[in-house]
Amino acid sequence: MSMLCYTLIIAFLIGTWAAPKSEDNVPLGSPATSDLSDTSCAQTHEGLKTSRNTDQRHPAPKKAEDQELGSVANIIVDPKLFQKRRFQSSRVLFSTQPPPLSRDEQSVEFLDNEDTLNRNIRAKRENHPVHNQGEHSVCDSVSDWVIKTTATDIRGNVVTVMEDINLNNEVYKQYFFETKCRNPSPNPVQSECRGIDSRLWNSYCTTTQTFVRALTMEGNQASWRFIRIDTACVCVIIRKTDNF
């Protein structure tokens, strides 16, 4: 019985050694290995071609700086921002061309036209000084439409003011009508007000500011904010105490 078991074991081992070897155990340089190498190379080559074609169809994304510059240069604004009348101001104008300035005692009127967003506003500004029947201003001032890039908001923070906006595929500029003293001087003596009795009063002309709603940038979105602009040149008088 034991001899029969030994005979079966020996026959099993001989059959195992004589069986063909699998691809995993094929030695290097054999035909099977060559076929596998050729197949792997072909698949790798196809993968490279596919990746190159994919790169051509989908170019690499732009740098963050380039994207930021592009967004700032072409900011698209929702027309709904201009539908609320409370956001409109006679000192803020959106136009595709520079607005006219008043000259020779003529007022400026902004009529309804295709180049102006403030179509419901008819603002009248007078250039100073105005001499009419011997009337003179206490302080000489000058007015002009200006473009602002930064300003101070109502909270005292410096904000970015939108210079150009894209609305319905049209590029508009944001203008501000500012009025300031004609010849500002840090020395109050050199900027005395006209017509003030210097024996009783010290006086000087100074530019005052007020708040207007302007379109500003908040992150990547446009929003309305109150900003400070120059609006008048006024006279400040101080009573002299030496004579009292």
Curated annotation (Swiss-Prot):
GO CC field: axon; dendrite; extracellular space; synaptic vesicle
Source organism: Tropidechis carinatus (Australian rough-scaled snake)
Keywords per UniProt: Cleavage on pair of basic residues, Disulfide bond, Growth factor, Lipid-binding, Metalloenzyme inhibitor, Metalloprotease inhibitor, Protease inhibitor, Secreted, Signal, Toxin
Keyword Nucleotide-binding carried by entry: no
Gene3D superfamilies for the chain: Cystine-knot cytokines
Disulfide cysteine pairs (residue numbers): 139-205, 181-233, 193-235
Main location group: secreted
Gene Ontology biological process: cell surface receptor protein tyrosine kinase signaling pathway; modulation of chemical synaptic transmission; negative regulation of neuron apoptotic process; nerve development; nerve growth factor signaling pathway; neuron projection morphogenesis
Subcellular location: Secreted
N-terminal signal peptide: 1-18
Function: Nerve growth factor is important for the development and maintenance of the sympathetic and sensory nervous systems. It stimulates division and differentiation of sympathetic and embryonic sensory neurons as well as basal forebrain cholinergic neurons in the brain. Its relevance in the snake venom is not clear. However, it has been shown to inhibit metalloproteinase-dependent proteolysis of platelet glycoprotein Ib alpha, suggesting a metalloproteinase inhibition to prevent metalloprotease autodigestion and/or protection against prey proteases.
Composition skew (Basic and acidic residues), residue ranges: 47-66
Protein name, per record: Venom nerve growth factor 2
GO function term, MF aspect, one: lipid binding
PROSITE patterns recorded: NGF_1, NGF_2
Tissue expression per record: Expressed by the venom gland.
Pfam families: NGF
Quaternary organization: Homodimer; non-covalently linked.
Family, per entry: Belongs to the NGF-beta family.
Chain positions listed as propeptide in the UniProt record: 19-125
PANTHER family assigned to the protein according to its UniProt record, in alphabetical order: BETA-NERVE GROWTH FACTOR, NERVE GROWTH FACTOR NGF -RELATED
